[in-house]
Structures are given as structure tokens and as C-alpha cells.
Amino acid sequence: MEAFSYTLLMALAAVTLFFAVAFRDPPKFDK
């Protein structure tokens, strides 16, 4: 269960970091 918790925490951290960068910088995605 510790492995699942660790993986979930890492996923949450990655998503948080991604959204922090995405919202800090203007979106540069070509629609």
C-alpha cells in the first residue's frame, strides 16, 4: 500500500507542477 500511496503522491506533484507552469506562462499550444 505504501507503493500505491507514493505513486499517487508523485502523480499529484507532477500534475501540480504542470499546472503551475501552464498557468504561469501563457499557453503556447497551436490549436
Curated annotation (Swiss-Prot):
Q: Please state where this protein is localized.
A: Cellular thylakoid membrane
Question: Keywords for this entry?
Answer: Membrane, Photosynthesis, Photosystem II, Thylakoid, Transmembrane, Transmembrane helix
What's the superkingdom here?
Bacteria
- SUPFAM superfamilies linked to this entry: Photosystem II reaction center protein T, PsbT
User: InterPro entries, alphabetically?
Assistant: PSII_PsbT, PSII_PsbT_sf
Listed under GO cellular component are:
photosystem II reaction center; plasma membrane-derived thylakoid membrane
Primary localization class, coarse: membrane
Q: Supply one GO BP term.
A: photosynthesis
What is an example of a Pfam family matching this protein? Answer: PsbT
Q: Does the keyword Phosphoprotein apply?
A: no
- Detail the disulphide connectivity of this chain as listed in its UniProt entry: none
List the membrane topology term(s). Answer: Single-pass membrane protein
Q: Where are the transmembrane segments?
A: 3-23
Q: Does the keyword Secreted apply?
A: no
What is stated as this protein's family in its record? Answer: Belongs to the PsbT family.
Q: How does it assemble?
A: PSII is composed of 1 copy each of membrane proteins PsbA, PsbB, PsbC, PsbD, PsbE, PsbF, PsbH, PsbI, PsbJ, PsbK, PsbL, PsbM, PsbT, PsbX, PsbY, Psb30/Ycf12, peripheral proteins PsbO, CyanoQ (PsbQ), PsbU, PsbV and a large number of cofactors. It forms dimeric complexes.
Summary of the function given for this chain in its UniProt record: Found at the monomer-monomer interface of the photosystem II (PS II) dimer, plays a role in assembly and dimerization of PSII. PSII is a light-driven water plastoquinone oxidoreductase, using light energy to abstract electrons from H(2)O, generating a proton gradient subsequently used for ATP formation.
Q: What is this protein called?
A: Photosystem II reaction center protein T
- Source organism of this protein record: Prochlorococcus marinus (strain MIT 9211)
Give the lineage.
Bacteria, Bacillati, Cyanobacteriota, Cyanophyceae, Synechococcales
